[in-house]
């Protein structure tokens, strides 16, 4: 049975119970869905093409900085103005174009630290306004990353926001524990390795608090994962995810194989296939992939410019003749497309590694 058979909406942006149904299907069939950070219509297209061509669902997400970029670097971000407008603009663009690709898309937003909560508030306001008109939120889901705060404050704020989100049937992703490296608004590059691991008890305390509100939430716990790519990384321990599931199952009087938690793998760039498979087998349903995609997008454009440099120095004049026009070489639709193709290729690799490929067949 293909994944689309469990969804009421087969293509385009899915919301509410469909998001849970997709994650349930992924957990049961032991695959994870790549979450691709998008910053422009071009990166959106690259991700959608890869998913369509590999018959896979996909998660598209905007970060705080990525959303501001989507709005335009010339727009002031005072009061999170650009980030709010950019994320909403991206959401409407993705909603309009995603059905053309014939695949289900989860529309998500990435890390929101406490200092960025005005951004979250602006998006949630847009969700509620959209819900009033259409009976569903604008975004499928949002992420709160309050891992810099105490666990008590982290969970308390998540409960506060999730109570509001549940009223519009929206999924919440939260982070507990510290993921190393740097991601929009959260910098943990100086964190010692021993702090990069969450305990089963802490993870379950999140489940205990949020499950009273709605089952529609996932947990990004720390198991040595790091944002970005570094020469020396922390010791990744995906087997810890199994202990989180086992502890939760025991507390809930369920079988260990039930894997009651929806888990998320942050800092996926640069990890091994073995680590991904171990994490997915323990209930990871979403893997964030940003840094690798950024480099892949650059590589296509970089290689094009290097290979065609003799055609890009002047509007007219190249090795074929001093009067030969170069417009077909410097047209942005040509060289930007090269970045889309290499980014799409990198996402295709992820779809294969995460076992997502063919999930819609």
Curated annotation (Swiss-Prot):
State which pathway it belongs to: Carbohydrate degradation; glycolysis; D-glyceraldehyde 3-phosphate and glycerone phosphate from D-glucose: step 4/4
Any one GO MF term held by the record is: fructose-bisphosphate aldolase activity
| GO BP terms, alphabetized | gluconeogenesis; glycolytic process
What are the record keywords, sorted? Glycolysis, Lyase, Metal-binding, Zinc
Q: Where does D-glyceraldehyde 3-phosphate bind?
A: 63
UniProt-listed Enzyme Commission number(s) = 4.1.2.13
Keyword Metal-binding annotated: yes
> Which residues are Zn(2+) 2-binding?
145, 175
Q: Which residues bind dihydroxyacetone phosphate?
A: 228, 267-269, 288-291
Which InterPro entries does the annotation name? Answer: Aldolase_TIM, FBA_II, Fruct_bisP_bact
What does it catalyze?
beta-D-fructose 1,6-bisphosphate = D-glyceraldehyde 3-phosphate + dihydroxyacetone phosphate
Lineage: superkingdom: Eukaryota
Give the UniProt entry's GO cellular component terms: cytosol
The active-site annotation reads 110 (proton donor)
Q: Which residues bind Zn(2+) 1?
A: 111, 227, 266
Q: What cofactors does the UniProt entry give for this protein? A: Zn(2+)
Q: What does the cofactor section's free text say about binding?
A: Binds 2 Zn(2+) ions per subunit. One is catalytic and the other provides a structural contribution.
Tell me which family the UniProt entry assigns to this protein. Answer: Belongs to the class II fructose-bisphosphate aldolase family.
Subunit structure and binding partners: Homodimer.
What exactly does this protein do?
A: Catalyzes the aldol condensation of dihydroxyacetone phosphate (DHAP or glycerone-phosphate) with glyceraldehyde 3-phosphate (G3P) to form fructose 1,6-bisphosphate (FBP) in gluconeogenesis and the reverse reaction in glycolysis.
Q: What name is this protein filed under? A: Fructose-bisphosphate aldolase
Organism, as annotated = Kluyveromyces lactis (strain ATCC 8585 / CBS 2359 / DSM 70799 / NBRC 1267 / NRRL Y-1140 / WM37)
């Amino acid at each position: 049975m293909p994944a689309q058979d469990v969804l009421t909406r087969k293509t385009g942006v899915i919301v509410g119970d469909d998001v849970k149904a997709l994650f349930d299907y992924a957990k049961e069939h032991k695959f994870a869905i790549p979450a691709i950070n998008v910053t422009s219509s071009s990166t959106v297209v690259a991700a959608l093409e890869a998913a369509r061509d590999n018959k896979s669902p996909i998660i598209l997400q905007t970060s705080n900085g990525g959303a501001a970029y989507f709005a335009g670097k010339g727009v002031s971000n005072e009061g999170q103005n650009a980030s709010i407008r950019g994320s909403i603009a991206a959401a409407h663009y993705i909603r309009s174009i995603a059905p053309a690709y014939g695949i289900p898309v989860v529309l998500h937003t990435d890390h929101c630290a406490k200092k960025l909560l005005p951004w979250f508030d602006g998006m949630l306001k847009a969700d509620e306004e959209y819900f009033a008109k259409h009976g569903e939120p604008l975004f499928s889901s949002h992420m709160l990353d309050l891992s810099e705060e105490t666990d008590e404050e982290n969970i308390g704020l998540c409960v506060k926001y999730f109570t509001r989100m549940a009223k519009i049937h929206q999924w919440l992703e939260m982070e507990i524990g510290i993921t190393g490296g740097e991601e929009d608004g959260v910098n943990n590059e100086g964190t010692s390795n021993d702090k990069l691991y969450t305990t089963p008890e802490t993870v379950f305390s999140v489940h205990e608090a949020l499950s009273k509100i709605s089952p529609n939430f996932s947990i990004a716990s720390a198991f040595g994962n790091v944002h970005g790519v570094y020469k020396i990384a922390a010791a990744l321990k995906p087997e810890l995810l199994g202990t989180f599931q086992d502890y939760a199952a025991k507390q809930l009087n369920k079988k260990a194989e039930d894997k009651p938690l929806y888990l998320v793998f942050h800092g996926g760039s640069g990890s091994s296939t073995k680590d991904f498979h171990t994490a997915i087998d323990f209930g990871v349903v979403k893997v964030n992939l940003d840094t690798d995609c950024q480099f892949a997008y650059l590589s296509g454009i970089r290689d094009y410019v290097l290979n065609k440099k003799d055609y890009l120095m002047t509007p007219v004049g190249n090795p074929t003749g001093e009067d030969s026009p170069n417009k077909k070489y410097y047209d942005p639709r040509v060289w930007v497309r090269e970045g889309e193709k290499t980014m799409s290729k990198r996402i295709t690799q992820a779809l294969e590694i995460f076992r997502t490929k063919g999930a819609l067949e």
